[in-house]
């Protein structure tokens, strides 16, 4: 008989809701703002409340939960919080589509998604939950903004943006499709508008240097991406004096990391907005029209790299700083005014963009670097890559500088030009200051006031927060705050005169740059974080999220930590000690293509599949009409490909524990996971077997007893397997994050325990230890099942400890020896680990299955200690 209150069959849904209620009633995962003893902060990137969880969320939060539950078993106090990244454009777009206030849409989504997360069985302290769209949260973001503005770390300047004249709004680059607004279809204009910027460049060197302190805890790939994004380079500012001082007196100063190519300059390119270009266009309508065309183009650096090269000669010239020769000045659409000085020296022989441009406009190409240091190298269309790609070449065609290599040439040009005031050495960063103004309604109000007399004045601290009105239903025609005098009309804090409140809101990356710190004391009303809570919990010990956040979010959060440190809010230099970037979740795609080439995508749930004996899909039909669909292969789950699997459907059918085990078993966490219905069923079968093993053992009613000193060989083997599994699972979770191999080890322990026959009370004690260990080690992955079954063994999972390894159980008294004849396996022996070589050979030869092969004389006897005997006859 099973115990009175437990089913013989695994009923996931019944036990999961019961266990979740137990956790809620006991506040099982609540922690204090300050904590003594060993403690740890585990954080998964918080979700945007889009309305429904997707499988990427399930993977992210299950990884965080496995790590959290593991450390709780290890006796540590673990903070694992959850909240909502709640501002942003999708809420505004949904509000426009459904004619509902973004606040209402957002909070309804939060309620639904919170319920979904709870059903996943996450060990979260829900008392710390917050949404970033509440004044209690963004009050302190505004407070920090004011402090930074006063210190000069935030400034305002004109910036070129994409303007939709119909919607009266600014568009992000990705919202411009073929030059038109994605919603209105109107031709997009370029406008210069004032925007606020964070001086992240002031921290560029520190952001770069501190990456070295993360090398043991962050993936190398992420560190490299951040290094490249910050992009420190040592180069030279070189001035080309004006050859037309009567028109444009100032020379052109360019920054280059390749001063060694100076003698290969055949033209200088400037941005369309460069003062020299504007001066040249004053009496040149054609040039003025070209400048306007460039201004209308994309402002994204990535687009410029791939866009068609466009240019026009200004008719002005500068003098080469070494030779004094006149060099033409061209306007080129690949030069950005916002980068460096807005001018570049063009060396077509050794730079791809310059080469394409020179070819298009028939400008000279002069080779000045050659790997072979030969003057007679033929220039070819493809050779520039070879010449430019390496700094190991030698200067040619460079007059007095011929024969010099990169560093020597750099030093020689500097020595020649610096005394004339035409050059100086300079460190530059690719990183640009962070523009945070958004001409949107659903965001954190920027706490600034515009006064005609006083200019920009920060809102006094006692008047914070500036609260965003939440009963607004936007209609898509610009920022509704601009039509609300009750919001923007105010008085100037400096002069008391009539003034206008800033109606731009902050980039939502600002909220996600400091939320991790707020979790330490979410209800604190005296500042961003309670000092003693920050002292207790920060930095985050383990951060988990997608690699797509490697640059922006993680860089901004690192920047904010340093800003908060310098305001005395937090200590330490970095927010996240360890980072785990989980891979994508992939699923099969299915579609039909119309004659026009338009694809209609079908959800995998609506597809009837036929598979071959190896499980591969051979045909697919849409269940709606029974007709074939095209099998598109596996791609990242997405709305656009309609290949998302609803986590709720999996939880309803199999239970959260099955979903969790599948997600952790299907692939290492940092690699892509291929969704597989068969894999989900396999995870469910595994849990059913665990359930049957445990309930079957309980049914027998064995009395509890200590492990005996003397055990049968089978019992010794099972104990060894049990303690090897403790060792492996502990290492796999803590050090390697190899959750898939940890589960594989639990499957092996399940197999070994299932095969073990209990014949004595001592055997029962060993089996009980194996089952209790299996359930405890499984708890981070399948907490509902584990807690339910452990309770039947008299163990409360919430108070349970990770099992400790009994070293004596790992030692082997016997070993299995393979016996070969002429290199072929013919038998096996179980012998003492201390057996002598002679005794081993004697026992091997005495095996009946071996003797039949020993008819002739034995030529050779090979013994590999602890492994095999090979008899050559």
From Swiss-Prot:
NCBIfam families: leuS_bact (TIGR00396). GO terms for molecular function: aminoacyl-tRNA deacylase activity; ATP binding; leucine-tRNA ligase activity. It comes from Acinetobacter baylyi (strain ATCC 33305 / BD413 / ADP1). InterPro entries: aa-tRNA-synth_I_CS, aa-tRNA-synth_Ia, Leu-tRNA-ligase, Leu_tRNA-synth_edit, M/V/L/I-tRNA-synth_anticd-bd, Methionyl/Leucyl_tRNA_Synth, Rossmann-like_a/b/a_fold, tRNAsynth_Ia_anticodon-bd. The gene is leuS. This is Leucine--tRNA ligase. Its main location: cytoplasm. ATP binds at residue 639. It comes from the Bacteria.
